[in-house]
Amino acid sequence: MRRSLTRFPLLPALPLAVLVALLFAPLAALAGAQKYEPLSASVHGALSRSVSDRAPQHSSFEDSAVATDWLAEMSGRLAKRIPDPVARLEFLRSVHYEATRAGLDPQLVLGLIQVESGFKKYAVSSAGARGFMQVMPFWVTLVGRSDDNLFHLRTNLRYGCTILRHYLDIERGDLYRALGRYNGSLGQAAYPNMVRAAWDKQWKYTRSALALR
């Protein structure tokens, strides 16, 4: 059974001025990428199975009221970045599904995507990382799926969430260190702090009274 993300050690609270500065810092200053590391046979098998699971997508929400509330709230916040309402809802449903499937908080994943790609589907970093979650191309070969397209919405989110889950497991739930691994900057504070700032200031979610009924 996966551990709940709420049990993971989080970063200490940051002063408001620091949060604002991190939110609007140039993304290029924090450019990084996952680093290639040989995998044990068991880890390779687990990652390959996770990425390869293409079962039909079902609802990842507790019920329809929660789904309606969450999608409406997040859609409003994301409208300027993804103007097309159909594409925006498909993106949000996919983020919620893939994050929940990997045992991650969807709000954390939204914060990470904001920092990694600014919600640009076809973003490519100077290191070659691709798509919404800036996945390095070596992963598709590493897990034995060299034909996977990292610019495909569900594929990119599946890889990104699976990789972050893998790093969380390596770091025994230490989110700070897992984010450092994800960005290729393990031990440095800038990237984890920036994701935390985006998560706290842009993507925190509290259910409305309607959704709680």
Segments from the language model and where they lie:
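Sec/Tat signal peptide C-region and signal peptidase I cleavage site
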Residues: L27-A31
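Short N-terminal segments immediately surrounding and downstream of signal-peptide cleavage
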Residues: A33-S50
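N-terminal secretory signal peptides that target proteins for export/translocation
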Residues: M1-P9
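Residue-level marker of intrinsically disordered, low-complexity segments enriched
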Residues: L16-V18, A41, R49, K80
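Short, aromatic- and cysteine-enriched interfacial helices/patches
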Residues: F8-L11, L210
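Bacterial N-terminal signal peptides
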Residues: A13-P26
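Catalytic glycan-binding domains that act on GlcNAc-containing polysaccharides
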Residues: D53-R213
